[in-house]
Amino acid sequence: MSATLGCALRLEEFSDFVQEVRGHRPFPWQTAYLQRVAESGIWPDLDIPTGLGKTSVIDAWCFLLAWQHSTGAERTVPVRLYFVVDRRLVVDQAHESARDLQQSLHDSGPTTVTGRVARALRELGGSDTALESVRMRGGVDWSSRWVRSPAQPAVISSTVDQYGSRLLFRGYHSSPRMRPIDAALCGMDALLVVDEAHIALPLLRTASDCAAYQATASHPVLASRAVQVVSLSATASACADRPRHSITDADRTHPVAGRRLNAQRRLTLLDASSNAKDTTTAFAQAATLAVDALLQVIERPVLGVVANTIRSARAAHHLLAQRADVDVVLLTGRSRSLDRERLLAHPLVAELLAGVRPDRAKPLVVVATQTVEVGIDISFAGLVTENASLAALVQRLGRLDRTGDLALAPAIVLRSNVQRDESTIPVYGGAAERTWAHLVEHAPVVEMAGLDVPALSGKLTEGLLVNPLTLPALLTDVDTSALNVAEPLIPVVHRTLIDAWARTSPAPVPDQEPAPFLHGLDTSPEDVLVLWRADLREIDGQPDFDQWATCMRQTPPHGAETVAIPARQLRRFLTRSAGADDTSDLEGTPSSSEAVPAGRRQPPPAMSPALRYDEREGQWVPVTVPRDLRPGSTVVLPARYGGHDAFGWTGTRNQPVTDLGDFPSTDTTPTRLDAHVLALLTTGDGVHIGRLSAAVSRATRRLRDEDPVETTGIVTELLDTLLNPAHPHDGPYADLAHTRLNRLRSVEQWSTAPAGRTEKHGHVVLDAADPSRLVLIPPRPPRGKRERTPGVADDAADASSLTRPVPLPQHSVAVAERASAFASALNLPPQLVAALRTAGHAHDCGKEHSRFQCMLCAGDRLLSETLDEPRAKSGMDPADHHGRRRAAQLAQWHPDMRHEAISALAVTAWLDSRPEHLRGDDDDLLVHLVAAHHGHARPLLPAVADPAPEKVTCTMPDHQEVIVDSADMGTDWAGPDRFHALNSRYGPWGLALLEATLRLADMACSEEGT
């Protein structure tokens, strides 16, 4: 239902909206873009110079979505906007912009333009939240469900790999059963905005091809909802005939935009490549000299040093950080998000982001990688940049005097590599060399040999003027393709591929990897997610893999403790292979291939062992040879290996890495009291591990030996001991440990009872194999508050059966109504709304199997047989993995048996009776939605028969009782043909959207305990 027409928004109010949200009026091009989209319904690509606010496309989308709803017009504006950048960012400006917009909408008064926009968005999404802002990152738990409703307006910032793999039904670091939901949300009702599209051209074309295939669906509504694609680059489009939107004279003469377009950036070349044996050292030394030269002439005390690789950036930072006359900060994108958040809170970084004061006592030098090229709103007064491709240099120059206020903004392009072949120069190859050769024809060149600071400083005022208005003349009649990284070979997306990708359960073998369709054929393998744990033990120098896996099940990983690393670099790190680490903050870049010895086949090099999460099997498995480090997987390393510090990935084995496994975003997840973990958190070293271990061991011994009524006192005493000032708390992460221990100290009751935690008391888990280790699980949140539990995936056998005990009839009605509400908010046709409502009623009727009910009663058969109503939810603690497995064993419910298989049998039998119940007009869709509501049946349910078949009585939506035989729950031979027909009818992403609508409704009701 649209907002009342009296509150209808007008396009002319966009300027007031931007003023209220951002504190300034939009530039002329921004207003013109909004009008153009509103009139045509088409989102043109943007050809806008850096510094003129291209991220404002988020504001335009938000306003247009609300405007269209408030006027009662048929919605054509997508409900989700994906802002994609193909690099690792230390600051995600698009996400920060979306978060500020979200907050403004939340805080706005009802009579303001922003308040009216917020009201329209709430009505449209059927939610109390006007807008969600989400960072898309992978995970192996429920945190990967990044949108709660398919109708929720949302801005999602992402990398190419994270968005693209999800679009293609193969989400990296995502549960296989979650992939259809991810694909639906990425491929339907979505606007894909790609920044720096010249390095993400494969994604542009792949997404456009996917949209074209979805448009062939025979269902007209779902055919029209395919993803729409927008490029924010002047040199890249999904196809040659795409409309483009550019600046006009109104922008050139604008008092603010015009000044930015005329910024006085002067470019000088510094050649440090002669006789450079170690190019990294040569870059660091030359960068230090260049910094000194810039300090002589800059008008504000802040300058940047941008390197092409993390290794070079760290080398320059190492030299500059030893000086007392400057403040230095290092920014790289490949770091754990929790480390990144702490770095952004550092006073120097906070000052940089707020704007450096001109009267600052010491100059601030920012050493960085490609991570500052986009996504961060900073302005340097001077710049040193390693030579790179033309596009990269233009982006880096865009960080120099962004406001155009300085009379002189000098930049030094530094070359320390000379090309001998395409692989000599890391990241950019021959494009960097050709760009240098072109610049030499126009800009002054200074040789490093014999150079001193005054000589270089004197050249800076003579540099080449480079800004958005002079750049076109500099590139007249120039083939810029030679100055940039070559366009990759992009494979064609065809229907056979899409049909194969849509088959997510089971996936085809062999399966087509999505990487070539996201980065091109001639690119390196995609990343792996890496995390470190300090409680992974060895026995006689050998890894105890069983203990490792147990620890990971007990405290599953979360997104804030992971970092994405190229698979080849992780192999090099674990095998201690020779050769420089050329890791950059770009994704999917071409790289030199890993060396393969000539002659006969060599055995794999010795490798430090690790642990990998097998998404297909849902288990942690050992990794002992390099080939098992598979791109796209999640890998756990012992903290003692090193490889990461407060700034991010180091690629070196120097210091142990702090274990951040106990600090996800929720406060109710398990916390390990382990001496090795606590020592790294509180002191940064292992000096007092013995004292910590002794304290925990004493408490563990008492918990085993003394009366359970003493449990709370013992745990409280242990926490007091750990919080005692006698234990050092001066480590870099001591505040995290101190805050968590204090929060646990506030828990009033603790118990070691097998039943686990409740809303009133926390649960203490003892480690039978290690007396110096225990785990504390805080009480569950009060009724009505949601909880997402790491490690409980949607594809677990009883995942939908967790949380509080809920009767099956109550849950079925709740899911039916929620699915219907979601479908109505999506403006789906009445027949599809009816189908989703009916599927919601029937989806869990297979849980009436007696052994499944026994499992939901923790294995208590007597209790299950005396229930007044069958259960949908067990009431078991989601964090109690052992308890869940024990309940299934006691009930003799095989972990691969699926209750939805029985539900599908019951729905099929019910439909055979031709019920008069309102259910839509597609019975095949109804059966599929029920069968697929945990991500299976795409196209097959697991072929697992009931070893002890029984008759199951299922209650259907019209209260008719249907009896089915669980012996029939094996292979559904009609499934593949039904799945193929439904994909043709609704499109691959359209069918996935219908599934997602039901599944998200089920998950929401499960979390809420309704």
Positions of predicted regions on the chain:
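Walker A/P-loop
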Residues: 41-61
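Inter-Walker segment of RecA-like/P-loop motor cores
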Residues: 106-177
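Divalent metal-dependent catalytic cores for phosphoryl transfer on phosphate-bearing substrates
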Residues: 427-436, 440, 798-805, 824-1010
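Conserved pre-motif I regulatory segment
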Residues: 2-48
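Conserved Walker A/P-loop ATP-binding site and its immediately adjacent core
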Residues: 75-103, 107-116, 161-165, 200, ...
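C-terminal helicase lobe and adjacent C-terminal extensions/tails of nucleic-acid helicase motors
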Residues: 284, 291-293, 300, 315, ...
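Conserved strand-helix element at the start of the C-terminal RecA-like helicase core
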Residues: 80-94, 294-321, 330
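Interdomain hinge/linker at the junction between the two RecA-like core domains of SF2 helicases
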Residues: 220-228, 232-297
